[in-house]
Amino acid sequence: MFSLQDLCRKNLFLPLEPLGKHVVQRLGLYWEGHGSVKRVGDCFICVDQIWILSIHKAVQIAASEGNEDIVKLFLLWKGSLQYAIIGALEGRQYDLIQKYYNQIGDCHQILPLIQDPEIYERCHELNVTCTFQCLFQHAIRDNMLPIFQKYGEDLNGNRGMVQLLYEMACRLQNYDIIKWIGFNLHVYNLEAIFSIAFVRKDLTLYSLGYMLLLDRMSTVDRNFISIITRHLEYASKKGLFDFVLESLKYGGQVDTVLFQAVKYNHRKILAHFIHEIPRETVEKLILHAVESRASRKTFNLLLSSINYCVNPFVKKLLHAVVKHKYMLIIKLLLERPKKKINLVDAALFKLVKYSTYKEIVKYMDEFSVDPKRVVKMAARLMRVDLIKKISNDAWEDKLERIKHLKQMVNTMNHRNGKNLLMYNIHNITGYTHLNTKEAFNLTKFYAVHNATCLFKEMCKSCFEHDKIQLRELLEDCLHIANRHAYIQIAETADECIKYIDLITPK
């Protein structure tokens, strides 16, 4: 419970002049050595009707002087108990400390308010259970460098604590203390600063890390070069452009940066360096972009730097496209408004040669490729499986399929490819009924293309049809064979004609 006097003092905002000095003193509103005190709002006081002080500063001064009554008054006026403790520590007023400290209970709450390192240390000592480690940790939080300067020698040899305090200072971005620890104590894992700098995206902390590193090693040191390379890889991977530039000040290869920038589509980094590097490097980056499945914008940036000229490395490019099954660059070159570069067929040939049926079908759908082109390529490359699957999918009707396969044979020059297509036709006809016209047409087709074995097979099959018509067909085939010097076809046709003549009644 407040006394009546306390209630009056707490809520008195009136001018003190009419009250007289005696009444002011009786009310406890006189501060020895300073004069009368009057409350001004909630945060200030007026001293001797002239000076304005904040209530916290006033209670600190009163406590340092040990004026318990005035301290009590200022606390009534919403002065801070924490500042009262600080003032008592400054004046070594231990009676006041003992009286008020228990109301706070934890000295650590007061530490951030203290600027004087000596008072800071005294305050920390109020908690008798605290250790030096605790003092150092709070000194980091409150940027109290003099504590380290005073007791730093006690940390020598304690590697664990030094590392802990160093990393804590890095996390709290206390640069002054980081520098002091880094230059004056042995930190066994100095590189921890870089990991924290990356997480917090703190370039100042990052630069400070290099300053500390270079205090221990030179830029030509193998370990330093390895560290720089790792940093460049990570910074470019995360798109931290300023960090990349900072690392490059101390060494490292731009190529390291560019390959990561391509892989993770960081075009700002790429655009900064792309016009400063040789064409050979750009070509390697484009191949890497295919492997990394880079974005459309990344590809356009790379291609524009070489004016979309891919001829010098087109074989390598096609190999990469097929190997990694990523066709975006083929589309981009085809989509150019002027001077389109068509690599569809070239890539298709590689795909047909090395890829699976599903991959080829996907490519056909993507670029609207005619199945005939694929089948003919498959025939030249002896991909029997592809001929069958793609022709089956493209032309479900067997007669339609035979018709298209025959057209392909007619337009092919590759001998082995033609033979493969004709054997495929023959396999279809093995389980397909052909009428007389279809059978005769196919027989003549085999004769025209010098498919001896298939011609013989068809001749045997045709004996079930009209013999007179068959004889006429065979005479045509014999004429074709003689004209082109197809000896075996001619012999077979001649034998069949003689046999028909033999079995036909006269």
From Swiss-Prot:
Induction is noted as: Expressed in the early phase of the viral replicative cycle.
- Keyword line: Early protein
| Cysteine pairings via disulfide bonds | none
Which Pfam families does this one have? DUF249 (PF03158)
What is the recorded function of this protein according to its Swiss-Prot or TrEMBL entry? Answer: Plays a role in virus cell tropism, and may be required for efficient virus replication in macrophages.
State the similarity comment: Belongs to the asfivirus MGF 505 family.
Protein name as it appears in the record = Protein MGF 505-9R
Per the UniProt record, the source organism is African swine fever virus (isolate Tick/South Africa/Pretoriuskop Pr4/1996) (ASFV)
